[in-house]
Every structure is written in structure tokens, then in C-alpha cells.
């Protein structure tokens, strides 16, 4: 990154040893390493965010190009979306007389059930008379 060779690093170490002394040099080196690590982490995060943003922008441009080729624009999509009913609108549009299917099945017998019940009663009555 900085293209620092071994000789430059040795020179920096000797100057640091003379200026800071042998007691404070390890602490300063540790702190400096910590801050360099944080700076690298921040730069890597920034780099990944920029790459992600570039990819997102590229995908957005591709999608818009495909929509233009298909003859779709944002207004027609928005109109189609607005024409669809939301679940809340569907629930509000139901009248109280509309019953759920399970309630209708539990409370009312179907006509075929009534017919079969009448037929069974008629068969039992005819057997009693015989």
C-alpha cells in the first residue's frame, strides 16, 4: 500500500526508539497498529459499499432498458398497481351478509343433503307400512 521496504521500516523503528524510548515504543506501536487496522477496515467497507452501489445502479439501468424494450413505463406499472385491490380494501368491501365458507357449511345444509334426508325418511316410512 505505501511501498515501505525493510530499510525504511528499520529507519522508522530506530527514530521511534530514540524519540519515544524503549518503555513507550511498544504502547505507541500497538495503538498505531490499532488505528491502522481501523482505517483499513473503514476503507474496505467503503470500497464494498461503492461496488455494491455500482452493481445496484447497473442492475437498475438494465431493468429500465428491458422495460423500455417491452413497452412498459413507470406510469403504466403504477396504474396497474393502483388498480389492484389491497387486502384491506377487499375486507372493507365485504358485506355483513357474506359468510365465510366454514360458517355457511356448519349452519346450512346443502340441498343434496336435504334431498337425501327426505328420501331416507320416505324409505323408512314405506318399510313401516309394509
Swiss-Prot record:
It is a single-pass membrane protein. It holds the Pfam family TatA_B_E. GO terms for biological process: protein transport by the Tat complex. The keyword Transport applies. Residues 57-67, 111-130 have a biased composition (Basic and acidic residues). One of its GO terms (cellular component) is TAT protein transport complex. Its main location: membrane. Keywords: Cell inner membrane, Cell membrane, Membrane, Protein transport, Translocation, Transmembrane, Transmembrane helix, Transport. Residues 57-130 are annotated as: Disordered. The chain crosses the membrane at residues 1-21. It comes from the Bacteria. One of its GO terms (molecular function) is protein transmembrane transporter activity. Belongs to the TatB family. NCBIfam families: tatB. The Tat system comprises two distinct complexes: a TatABC complex, containing multiple copies of TatA, TatB and TatC subunits, and a separate TatA complex, containing only TatA subunits. Substrates initially bind to the TatABC complex, which probably triggers association of the separate TatA complex to form the active translocon. Part of the twin-arginine translocation (Tat) system that transports large folded proteins containing a characteristic twin-arginine motif in their signal peptide across membranes. Together with TatC, TatB is part of a receptor directly interacting with Tat signal peptides. TatB may form an oligomeric binding site that transiently accommodates folded Tat precursor proteins before their translocation. This is Sec-independent protein translocase protein TatB. It comes from Alcanivorax borkumensis (strain ATCC 700651 / DSM 11573 / NCIMB 13689 / SK2). The lineage of its organism: Bacteria, Pseudomonadati, Pseudomonadota, Gammaproteobacteria, Oceanospirillales.
